[in-house]
Amino acid sequence: SSTPTYNPTTFPFQLDQARLDARPIKTVVIAHVNLGVQSRNYLDKEAPRVDAQVASYLKENGFKVLPQRDFEQHWNAAVRAFGNPVDPTSGKLNRKTFALIMTRVRDEMAKSTKLDAFIFTDLVELEASFSEGLKHVARWDGVTRTPSLQGPGDGVSAEFDWNILAAVVSLQVSIYDMDLEPVFSSRGGIEATDAIDRRSSTGRYVRRRNILGNETYIAEGIRLAFH
């Protein structure tokens, strides 16, 4: 059977059309920090590569993208003034400190640039099972993926429990205007970060060696996250 063009797991985006109409967005900057929960370390390492692809996508779609280092410099200066909003032990975000820092960054960037919006690109880890249909596909946030296999061996153990949840990653995009009000948010699936371990007799998932290695999947996740 042919796969449907619309994936029912497509994320329900939020858009404030009135704010966007009142002040159209042309010039943006991609933040190097997360808006929500901190990304897992193994995903955080891949974030600069994903951000570079997001920047290319935005430029192709007619936006002017300011260098991330501009944001980073102002962010670091504001952190020196107000403290780090992220608790290094728990990874929790202090929203009050975060708001103070963002207000300072906004004020500084408004002086020196024609910035219209800040874009946050969080790599979020979710869970999905490869339990759908004979091909064992997982669907989440608009994508359909088949499982990866890792390690020596031939195929998947007959005892493998396809209902086990595997770690998957999505790109969460949040856009804030110069009033620091949310104008858009959505999420696009990228790929599973777990693979089926062929060395296990009963079958289990292990972390993939090559995380976010498929550029096409990243591009699809970006496209979905901006729609």
PLM regions: where:
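C-terminal/domain-edge helix-coil "capping" segments
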Residues: S1-K26, T113, E125-H227
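Acidic/histidine-rich, surface-exposed loop or edge segments in extracytoplasmic proteins
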Residues: P24-R40, G83-N84, Y205-V206
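N-terminal segment of the mature soluble domain
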Residues: V37-A128, Q172, Y176, P182-S185
